[in-house]
Amino acid sequence: MGRSISLPLVATLTISLTACTSQTIRPEEYSGFLHDYSQLTEKKLPSGKKVLAWVSPTLHTHPYTRVYIEPSLFYPEMLPTERAPQSTLSAVTHYYDTALKHELGKVMTVVETPGPDTLIIRSSIISVAARTQSLRFYEWLPVTLLAAGVSTATGIRDQDSEITTEVAVLDAVDQAVVAQIVRKETGRPLDNDKQVMTLDDFKPVLDGWAFDMRQAYSSGGK
């Protein structure tokens, strides 16, 4: 008679995998880059994506016509690893800045120096990571569940690249914070736990963040 996998074990695996695949930012994951996280609430962007954000009522009462993009950075400082080398980290922040300038430049004038009627975009990358993908439906069958466990243990299961950002938007004159955003998203899938992550794994996410910021500003932050 074949051995069966106990229901408690399956339940435990289910809970564990669900926790690993969640894209919700928990308070303990906040980096400290933003001054105040207490007013963040879940908001649905025009693109349909959900993020944690706060927008001051004064943001769209002031005629901001210009935007200054501060160079983005890793916060806290992220040391390069074999899977996330310095070349990837540098490329990610540079591309993030370029994408923001490209999208926001469609609705505002991008300037090299902050001044009157200017918004400052102060962005950070707080994590770049890889996580093992959750089990697919067919892998919950008893035999394939065991096989999936072996694949995970040997490091051959597919993984997801993952990146998180925190952004503060400030008035350039008085440095008052007028908006804050925190979001985590999944990039391109990785073949295994040895694959080196590159900029290409995160480009769609970075493009999406910049696009959403432009759309949110154009829609009045609603």
Model features per residue range: what roles?
Residues 58-122:
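N-terminal segment of the mature soluble domain
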Residues 74-77, 127-131, 185-188:
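Solvent-exposed loop/turn segments at secondary-structure junctions
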Residues 16-19:
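C-terminal motif of bacterial Sec signal peptides marking the signal peptidase cleavage site
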Residues 80-92, 143-150, 190-194:
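A solvent-exposed, charged loop/short amphipathic helix patch at secondary-structure junctions
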Residues 102, 106-173:
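Surface-exposed short loop/turn segments
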Residues 53, 66-73, 118-126, 166-168, ...:
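Soluble periplasmic/extracytoplasmic beta-strand elements of cell-envelope proteins
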Residues 21-56, 155-164, 168-222:
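C-terminal/domain-edge helix-coil "capping" segments
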Residues 1-9:
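Bacterial N-terminal signal peptides that target proteins for export
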